[in-house]
């Protein structure tokens, strides 16, 4: 289910009030864990490799791309996860964990500071590596 359709489906009668509440609950719960995980992974990354580029953002975006590809593909035609938990993981956790807005801001600041090569590298690394890892997650899920 597409997240923006929760309320629409509730009013259309295809989603119960309990189902709607559970999806919203899991999105919030998993979202909190996603935010905390992003904070931890970014901080850990910066202590390992420094802050020459926004490596913390790159690492969470790469990991998030892989995990989203894996979870979406592994649960696409499966009942391993309830729809509510799946929504919590994909929309909540991944929404809190990945950071496209931060990537955009940090890249803009690099341009603004005159670090054009670093800004370009940040764009290429985030887009290319995240696409590759999303594909790897999907490929892994198909083999499970």
Where would I find each of the regions flagged by the language model?
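Membrane-interface helix-loop junctions in multi-pass transporters/channels
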Residues: 3-144
């Amino acid at each position: 289910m597409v997240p923006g359709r929760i309320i629409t489906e509730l009013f259309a009668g295809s989603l119960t009030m309990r189902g709607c509440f559970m999806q919203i609950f899991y999105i919030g719960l998993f979202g909190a864990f996603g935010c905390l995980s992003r904070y931890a992974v970014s901080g850990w990354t910066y202590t390992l490799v420094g802050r020459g580029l926004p490596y913390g953002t790159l690492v969470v975006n790469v990991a998030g791309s892989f995990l989203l590809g894996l979870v979406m593909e592994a649960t696409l035609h499966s009942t391993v996860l309830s729809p509510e938990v799946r929504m919590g993981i994909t929309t909540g956790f991944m929404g809190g964990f990945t950071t496209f807005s931060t990537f955009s801001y940090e890249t803009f600041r690099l341009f603004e500071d005159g670090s054009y090569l670093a800004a370009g590298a940040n764009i290429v690394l985030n887009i290319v590596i995240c696409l590759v890892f999303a594909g790897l997650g999907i490929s892994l899920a198909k083999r499970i």
